[in-house]
Amino acid sequence: MPTKHKALVIVLLIVAASFAVAAEDGPEEVIRGLYKAHQPREHRELNLRNHAVLSKYFSPELTKLFLRNVQVERDCPKGDLCGLEFDPILGSQDFDDHLAFKLHITEATWPQTGRFEARFKLFNEEKPEQEQVLVFQLVQVKNGWRIDDIIYTKDNASLKAVITAIVKEAADLKK
């Protein structure tokens, strides 16, 4: 086998192995992977408009809601604000551009399986009691663990509820 073919086979095997590991990731690894992929302070943001990207981290139901939000934004009259008006992964509109991001994840105690709390600062000078606290509800689907909802503890709101309300409001305005 020529050297080029061997190199190609090795690369393909490595890529396939990385996908196999990703499918086997536990719920905490899914959350960590989400924050590793989504780093707006580093100008790397997750494409929340892409089905393939969304389904890597989110449940089928939440993926559909994200895509409905995309449609609401697309149908929005010019000059209006429509759809999510905050970063749903950070749970905020603002953050320090030079943030020293440190993610702390803890698992909820039984019987709340698949529930994890993520804590992090949005601004470097924040005290621990000012940290952003998001609760992730994960479900196991055929591809592994996926995020099914995010609860924003400071606002007592859930991502599913927020997007559902946005979609409903947009539908009501069309009537």
Question: Where are the regions that the model predicts?
Answer:
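Surface-exposed patches in mature extracellular/periplasmic domains of secreted proteins
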Residues: E42-N50, L54
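Low-complexity, intrinsically disordered terminal/linker segments enriched in charged
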Residues: Q112-V133, V141, D148-K175
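Bacterial N-terminal signal peptides that target proteins for export
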Residues: M1-V9
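Non-catalytic interaction/Regulatory regions outside core domains
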Residues: Y35, H51, S55-T63
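Short, aromatic-enriched amphipathic alpha-helices that serve as compact interaction elements
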Residues: D25-H43
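N-terminal signal peptide c-region/cleavage motif recognized by signal peptidases
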Residues: V15-A20
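Surface-exposed, charged secondary-structure patches
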Residues: S59-P128
